[in-house]
Amino acid sequence: KGDASIPIDGLIWMVSIDEMKDRVRQKMQDGFTVLKFKIGALDFQSEYELLSQVRKEFGAALEIRVDANGAFEEKNVKGVLAKLDAINVHSIEQPVRPGQRKLMREICQETSVPIALDEELIGIHLIEDKVEVLESIRPQYIILKPSLHGGLVGTLEWISLAKEMGIGWWITSALESSIGLEVIARMA
């Protein structure tokens, strides 16, 4: 058995402040230094206050990522991103619904919070379509789920394109079985 490991992030769902702090403490005791918070389920001001308190208590030792699952709209997304920037959030996954490429490109260019495409990539299998989505949006990151991106070959195509375009990427799962998780781990 080797000493090498694959870094993973811990997932925190939005709940009460005390419960969230307990979960964050537990994750940090378990060795996590990167936590992803699901946002967009509550009103954003409440979520922002929760994230602000977590940032205040845990400081720079904790890398905060957020996943919005397309929860925000053109009228509020820039304000949301400005607030997330104020608390030094690492990145936000899919801030607006898929299919809004012009808006997504605009926020990728204008915000200092890096944008990660997630749901935007699902169902895109042809290489020319992959090139088109990445060139039209120019995200800072892409999130890859092999079971949703054509398996190993489709995922490796996304990785190759991302590298060519200077786009960061990471691999995650979409409720895979233990066999699927092993394949993802071997890819990482």
Residue ranges and their predicted role:
Residues Q26-K38:
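Catalytic domains of carbohydrate-active enzymes, especially glycoside hydrolases
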